[in-house]
From Swiss-Prot:
The modification Phosphoserine is found at residue 721. It catalyses: L-seryl-[protein] + ATP = O-phospho-L-seryl-[protein] + ADP + H(+); L-threonyl-[protein] + ATP = O-phospho-L-threonyl-[protein] + ADP + H(+). The modification Phosphothreonine is found at residues 722, 727. It is a single-pass type I membrane protein. Residues 532-868 are cytoplasmic. It holds the Pfam family LRR_1. ATP binds at residues 569-577, 590. Its main location: membrane. Residues 24-510 are extracellular. It comes from Arabidopsis thaliana. It is found in: Cell membrane. This is Leucine-rich repeat receptor-like serine/threonine-protein kinase At2g14510. The active site is at residue 687. InterPro entries: Kinase-like_dom_sf, Leu-rich_rpt, LRR_dom_sf, Malectin-like_Carb-bd_dom, Prot_kinase_dom, Protein_kinase_ATP_BS, Ser/Thr_kinase_AS. The lineage of its organism: Eukaryota, Viridiplantae, Streptophyta, Embryophyta, Tracheophyta.
């Protein structure tokens, strides 16, 4: 089976259109006929699909018409015109889509010798900043065309489809089609799904698509000589799994002509390293007699997956839950009759996909929207301003500079140069949405109006060039303050005045200067007196700030200690954590992600907290970097990663035994307790979770990640009203509903961590009857069976009294009412008792095996267990 669909088959086939479904709407469909004149549209006769012009979705390109011949009148109508791109390297269609929506994206290419050169066009096709495929539009036959199709979840509300010139031939395209799919269909563990085939098994020669197929999948007929086709006119009902195969597809099927032989379907991947998914469609379409049975084994590459009996006149879809690799790139699905079956195996249809990874993150969505609004406002026609503004780097927009940390972090725009660009009108307000901008150059244009105050809100902005325009008025006070306090350099024409500044008379200058000298002298003497008083006091403490030089590093030093960010330890909402060395000692370096909108606030909070608090169970801050938008935190290195890695088995090696889990819980509780009662003012962590509990060389536990921490008032009824922050599954429901933050919010989160350590269950697991761990634990507790709750990786190496006490404590911590939860002092005390009970039992039972273990879990709301 060829891995690339030839659209000649589609063009030559007659589409099957069922009159009963002609009323299907095309909501969410995008159907572009590339090259169609502006404002024109039509209904394609073979599919009833409405096609519109592509003019509003592309900035460049020229239109062409295929050469007429005897077959022209029979081909797919969107093939008759096309758009080609003789100018520029990258030309991109920009489509408005719904972020997070799963789409079937189809691009169609039909050469038709439009240029009279008989030259096969070859070029690359990109989806956003990532390569999708290489296109080779064959010219061997005038009917040949190529379709490239993919199932993809959109990352933003803008989708860029780009044609990239790779040689001497000119990229071209005939049509673009987008069809929204149901969110829970065609799900890959990672990446997107590149279509290889949609086959239905029949001896017909008709292709089937919309309106019979509500998703507009194009089903091609397929058969093999050793197969026999069967069909029915009876309606086959669909199953609610969302795949909705058309009646014309599911009413036909193939069986092996030799009833004792298997039904085998084989396909080839482009590379032996590729991964694939197969979707098999089954429905029993024969009326079986009482003594007839159809049951068969489904094997993939020789591995027996399931014994299956098709449902009578009801369609079901089966697929491999994990991607399949095939030896030598040759994949095989085989249906073999079981011993008790009287009938041969049957299959109605199959869809084949290969997995394609799109690793490069798109540029920050808000900044893409902003830069495109700027482009629209000023009618900029720069040919490079298409697609993603930052990546791939070789296609970045002229005049735009970006900070690209790694492929998993969205790039940020840090410099915009629009000098000598013929700009007119006022300075665009969209510029303020480029929140990481360091330099802005709008010089030598025809801009009018005043210098806008919003420029002062762009915190990283260091240089602004506005000379050579027709601006008027004065520099806003906020910008003058930035010049004075932050070192901002603002270049404006002489007619732009500074507010509050006048030319004083010479005698006034002399008087003011004299008074100033006296005032300065007095202030200096007062400051010296105050400083000496403070220095002599042993009870007063100087609060550390971000200006402490002994722990502040330059960004170049951060790069040096991480060997230019060579080894990644992990990633989180703040950014990427790298391994490094400082004075021959290992350190962990957390670098702020440019995409974090509250990154600097959290960074500052964490530095200020860790500079003033010290506890054996809080991770130590070695230093920090605060250099423009380059922010980093340098911590002590924790050799054994975080708790969740060990509970989930991602660290490999031996698992944590029961006593180790209790010790880790105790030490974590002591760290939280110190924040609650040992700090002045007291602090709430707000993001207690298993990934924020780090483990040292000897598995000593330390709490980390203080970016969300907040101070709180002391008192039983005291709370802080604040926006909700934290991690789903660990959030205190009372905090979530009322925005009331207290130390009991940390207690709730710790209860979830404790429940993870006890049960070995994920916090949220959709495959469970009860998705959330608390609900699951409550249902298990109703049976009073401790073994059904405890992590099976513990292999029953725990004491029931110790484990019950720990479980009851966890459920108490996650009580819906914060007033019913214990404080962290009591939690630490109770956990110590759990460990003492366990150790006492071990001493009394020296012959027990001490197997090690591992676990994972978390959830929302629950009650104290009553079963025992």
């Amino acid at each position: 089976m060829e891995t690339r669909n030839k659209f000649m088959l589609l063009a030559c086939a007659t589409f099957s259109i069922m009159s009963l479904v002609k009323s299907q709407n095309q909501q969410g469909f995008i159907s572009l006929d590339c090259g169609l004149p502006s404002k024109e549209s039509y209904i394609e006769p073979s599919s009833n699909l409405t096609f519109i012009s592509d003019v509003n979705f592309i900035r460049g390109g020229k239109t062409g018409n295929i050469q007429n011949n005897s077959r022209t009148n029979f081909i797919f109508k969107p093939f008759k015109v096309l758009r080609y791109f003789p100018d520029g390297i990258r030309n991109c269609y920009s489509l408005s889509v719904k972020q997070g929506t799963k789409y079937l994206i189809r691009t169609l290419f039909y050469y038709g010798n439009y240029d009279g050169l008989n030259t096969s066009p070859r070029f690359d096709l990109f989806l956003g900043p990532n390569i999708w495929t290489s296109v080779d539009v064959l010219i061997a036959d005038v009917g040949d065309g190529v379709v490239e199709e993919i199932v993809h979840v959109t990352r933003s509300n803008i989708l860029d489809i780009c044609l990239v010139k790779t040689g001497t031939s000119t990229p071209m395209i005939s049509a673009i089609e987008l069809r929204p799919l149901r969110y829970d269909t065609y799900t890959a563990r990672t990446g997107s799904l590149k279509s290889m085939a949609h086959f239905y098994f029949t001896n017909s020669d008709e292709a089937i698509r919309y309106p019979e197929d509500v998703y507009d999948r194009v089903w091609m007929p397929y058969s093999q000589p050793e197969w026999t086709q069967i069909n029915t006119t009876r309606n086959v009902s669909g199953f609610s799994d969302g795949y909705n195969p058309p009646q014309g597809v599911i009413q036909t099927a193939s069986i092996p002509t030799n009833g004792s032989e298997p039904l085998t379907f084989t396909w080839n991947l482009e590379s032996s390293d590729d991964e694939t998914y197969a979707y098999l469609f089954f429905a029993e379409i024969q009326q079986l007699k009482v003594n007839e049975t159809r049951e068969f084994k489904i094997l993939a590459n020789g591995v027996d997956y399931i014994d299956y009996t098709p449902w009578k006149f009801e369609a079901r879809t089966l697929s491999n839950p994990a991607p399949l690799k095939c030896e030598g790139g040759v994949c095989r699905v085989q249906l073999s009759k079981t011993p008790k079956s009287t009938l041969p195996p049957l299959m109605n249809a199959i869809e084949i996909f290969s997995v394609i990874q799109f690793p490069q993150s798109d540029t920050n969505t808000d900044e893409v929207i902003a830069i495109k609004k700027i482009q629209s406002t000023y009618q900029l026609s720069r040919i490079s301003w298409q697609g993603d503004p930052c990546v791939p780097k070789q296609f970045s927009w002229m005049g735009v500079s970006c900070n690209v940390i790694d492929i998993s972090t969205p790039p940020r725009i840090i410099s915009l140069d629009l000098s000598l660009s013929g700009l007119t009108g006022v300075i665009s307000p969209s510029i303020q949405n480029l929140t990481m901008l360091r330099e802005l150059d709008l010089s030598n244009n025809n801009l009018t109006g005043e210098v806008p105050e919003f420029l002062a809100t762009i915190k990283p902005l260091l240089v602004i060039h506005l000379r050579g325009n027709n601006l008027r008025g004065s520099v806003p006070q906020a910008l003058q303050d930035r010049e004075k306090n932050d070192g901002l350099k603002l270049f404006v024409d002489p007619n732009i005045t500074r507010r509050g500044k006048h030319q004083p008379k010479s005698w006034l200058v002399a008087i003011v200067a004299s008074i100033s000298c006296v005032a300065v002298t007095i202030i200096v003497l007062v400051l010296i007196f105050i400083f000496r008083r403070r220095k002599s006091s042993t009870r007063k403490v100087i609060r550390p700030s971000l200006e402490m030089k002994n722990r502040r590093f330059k960004y170049s030093e951060v790069k040096e200690m991480t060997n230019n960010f060579e080894v990644v330890l992990g990633k989180g909402g703040f950014g990427v954590v790298y391994h490094g060395f400082l004075n021959n000692e290992q350190v962990a370096v957390k670098v702020l992600s440019q995409s974090s909108t509250q990154g600097y606030k959290e960074f500052k909070t964490e530095v200020e907290l860790l500079l003033r608090v010290h506890h054996v169970n809080l991770v130590s801050l070695v230093g920090y970097c605060d250099e423009g938008i380059d922010l980093a935190l340098i911590y002590e290195f924790m050799e054994n990663g975080n708790l969740k890695e060990h509970l989930s088995g991602k660290r490999g090696g031996s698992v944590l035994n029961w006593s180790s889990r209790l010790k880790i819980a105790i030490e974590s509780a002591l760290g939280i307790e110190y924040l609650h009662i040992g700090c002045q003012p007291p602090m709430v962590h707000r993001d207690v979770k298993s990934t924020n509990i780090l483990l040292g060389l000897r598995f000593e536990a330390k709490l980390a990640d203080f970016g969300l921490s907040r101070s709180f008032l002391v008192g039983s009824q005291a709370h802080v009203s604040t926006n909700v922050a934290g991690t789903l599954g660990y959030l205190d429901p009372e905090y979530y509903l009322k925005n009331w933050l207290t130390e009991k919010s940390d207690v709730y989160s710790f209860g979830i961590v404790l429940l993870e350590s006890i049960t070995g269950q994920p916090v949220i697991e959709q495959s469970r009857d009860k998705s959330y761990i608390v609900e699951w634990a409550k249902s298990m507790l109703a049976n009073g069976d401790i073994e059904s709750i405890m992590d099976p990786n513990l292999h029953q190496d725990y004491d029931s009294s110790s484990s019950w006490k720990a479980l009851e404590l966890a459920m108490l911590c996650i009580n819906p009412s914060s007033t019913q939860r214990p404080n962290m002092t009591r939690v630490a005390h109770e956990l110590n008792e759990c460990l003492e009970i366990y150790n006492l039992t071990k001493i009394r039972s020296q012959d027990q095996n001490s197997s090690k273990s591992l676990g994972h879990t978390v959830t929302f709301i629950s009650d104290i267990p009553s079963a025992r």
